[in-house]
A protein has these predicted regions:
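Cap/lid segment of the alpha/beta-hydrolase catalytic domain
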Residues: 1, 13, 241-247, 251-383, ...
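Conserved loop/turn motif of beta-propeller repeat scaffolds
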Residues: 1, 32, 82, 127, ...
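A flexible loop/linker signature enriched in serine peptidases of the S9 family
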Residues: 1-3, 18-23, 29, 38-49, ...
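Short loop/turn segments that connect beta-strands within beta-propeller blades
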Residues: 8-12, 54-58, 101-105, 147-151, ...
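A short beta-strand motif characteristic of beta-propeller blades
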Residues: 13-18, 62-66, 108-113, 156-161, ...
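Hydrophobic beta-strand positions that form the internal "hydrophobic ladder"
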Residues: 35, 85, 130-132, 178, ...
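Non-catalytic accessory segments flanking enzyme active sites
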Residues: 72-125, 158, 169-170, 190, ...
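Active-site-proximal cap/loop segments of hydrolase catalytic domains
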Residues: 330-531
Length: 531
């Protein structure tokens, strides 16, 4: 929850007016005195109301919009062109926008196009047109445009057509160029299109497994594209790319305290075959002098929900494991969108078990390829990825030396069946509504809490936050309690309840490192690594 303050930049004085209970979503109108902001629902903590505030005036703020459907997230921003204030509404399967001329802050917001089930899109403005990335009749999205005076869907015209093997993600508009961020073969690429000639090219990143994205580009009339690049061995790096000469200029690279030599580390992209024949990409990183011709300790991570793709990025924290001989691997399982929208649809609702089976099959592939063995294989996931961990240790309890389930969503049926729990109704498109029998039966068949049996589980660390509003603290607690009642053998089961943390851990710049240290201490102890 944010408080909004206003400061006079000429005098340096902070104005006494303060706005509380905000999401932090703010947009200035062009009169430099009107601001639009989003307030939170005190129970669900969702942004649900958009207000207009006049800086320096004592009149009450005016409510511009109230979203009463709690399956939607809402906010407000200003278009890059500076011409429009834009209210956005997004749920699991729906996007919706309202626009207002930023020169007329006292006007009325106009809906961009009628809200439609299963229609997801994003908008940007340049000159006198809106550009739209949409899944309308395009599973992996296409790019369209329309006049800013006629924005309903019947007026949209295609700019870039749908491609079955390419997932169009985002765009950046320039006067002479159009930049498209897209995913092909599971990797994010940046495509540069010359608006005049129509010629296009791609930036060569020079690595096999990486991630990249368009950074902040405030100007239209420039030939420089600013983007960010990272890989499992390359720290986050900001570049300016000349779209005419194709020359790169490194502007900044994150410093690794204590020194870092990327030449000591190697990354790979390998592919496992799922039990249904689908391909599962796996990204790995290890220290070259530690990866000997014998199985190593290996930490396998995945998330696999909400269409969120876990790209291979650099982590200085991870070096602590790599320098001690661990291999770190990301299984790009279904439930994310590694191969486009179909990957997501194949890992949600009544296809959710594909997420778990992909993770298990990725682990078995790593064993088969002799990167590790079960006695050295560890699993990790958090939140919805914690559900993944809870499921895979039920399916294959003897496959793992240890497992970390962070703030895990493990009591799926109970949570999804209770619409009074904040955020539940907004999750039904992802997991299904167990008040319907087909969803209930399927969800019950994999729900980690409900599928606990009297068996020997791997060593486990389960973490939770007392102030977690997304996975309430009692969910991991009851899960661990039931595990203890069913626990066989002599493996260790730890519960860490952080009494100061929410879903994303403790606030503060450095406090999260204590949580990393706890997880790594668990792994190193099991691996017999003492220093």
């Amino acid at each position: 929850i944010y408080d909004i303050y206003f400061k006079n930049l000429k005098t340096g004085k902070v104005i006494s007016q303060t706005i509380s209970n905000s999401t932090g979503s703010v947009a200035w109108a062009n009169d430099n005195k009107t601001v639009f902001y989003t307030s939170k629902n005190q129970t669900t903590l969702l942004g649900e109301k958009i207000w207009r505030h006049k800086v320096g005036e004592k009149s009450d703020d005016k409510l511009m919009y109230h979203e009463k459907d709690d399956t939607f997230y809402n906010g407000v921003y200003k278009s890059k062109s500076g011409k429009f204030i834009i209210i956005y509404h997004s749920s699991t399967l729906i996007s919706d926008y309202q626009i207002l001329n930023a020169d007329n802050p006292d006007g009325t917001f106009k809906r961009f196009t009628p809200r439609d089930f299963n229609h997801e899109y994003s908008i940007d403005h340049f000159d006198d047109k809106f550009y739209i990335i949409t899944n309308w009749k395009a599973e992996n999205n296409r790019l369209m445009e329309t006049s800013d005076q006629k924005t309903s869907i019947s007026n949209w015209k295609e700019v870039i057509s749908h491609r079955k093997d390419v997932h169009l993600l985002s765009m950046e508009i320039f006067t002479n160029h159009l930049v498209i961020s897209e995913r092909k073969n599971g990797l994010r690429e940046l495509r540069i299109i010359n608006q005049g000639s129509g010629e296009d090219s791609y930036i060569d990143f020079g690595e096999d497994t990486y991630t990249s994205w368009i950074s902040v580009n405030e100007e239209f009339n420039t030939n420089l594209l600013r983007y960010t690049f990272s890989s499992l061995t390359t720290p986050f790096s900001t570049y300016d790319y000349n779209m005419d000469t194709k020359k790169l200029d490194l502007k900044k690279r994150d410093e690794v305290v204590g020194g870092y030599d990327s030449n000591k580390y190697a990354s790979e992209r390998m592919y496992a075959t799922a039990r249904d024949g689908k391909t599962i990409p796996i990204s790995l990183v290890y220290r070259k002098d530690k990866k000997l011709n014998q199985p190593q300790n290996l930490l396998l991570y995945a998330y696999g929900a909400y269409g969120s793709t876990i790209d291979p990025y650099f982590s200085s924290v991870r070096l602590s494991l790599l320098d001690r001989g661990f291999i770190y691997a990301i299984a790009h399982v279904r439930g994310g969108q590694i191969y486009g929208r179909q990957s997501y649809d194949d890992g949600k609702v009544l296809n959710k078990k594909n997420t778990f089976f992909d993770f298990i099959d990725a682990g078995k592939h790593l064993i088969q390829e002799e990167y590790t063995i079960s006695e050295k294989l560890y699993a990790q996931g958090g939140s919805a990825g914690g559900l993944l961990i809870g499921a895979v240790v039920n399916y294959e309890p003897l496959m793992w030396k240890g497992a970390i389930a962070a703030v895990p969503f493990v009591d799926a049926v109970t949570t999804m069946a209770d619409p009074t729990i904040p955020l539940t109704s907004g999750e039904w498109d992802e997991w299904g509504d167990p008040r319907e029998k087909k969803y209930y039966d399927y969800m019950l068949s994999y729900s980690p809490y409900d599928q606990i049996t009297n068996t020997e589980y791997p060593n486990m660390l389960v973490t939770s936050g007392f102030f977690d509003s997304q996975v309430q603290y009692w969910e991991p607690l009851k899960y661990v309690a039931k595990l203890r009642d069913s626990w066989q053998g002599y493996n260790k089961l730890y519960l860490h309840m952080n009494m100061e943390a929410g879903h994303s851990g403790k606030s503060g710049r450095f406090r999260r490192y204590k949580e990393y240290a706890l997880e790594y201490a668990f792994l190193l102890d099991l691996g017999g690594i003492k220093k």
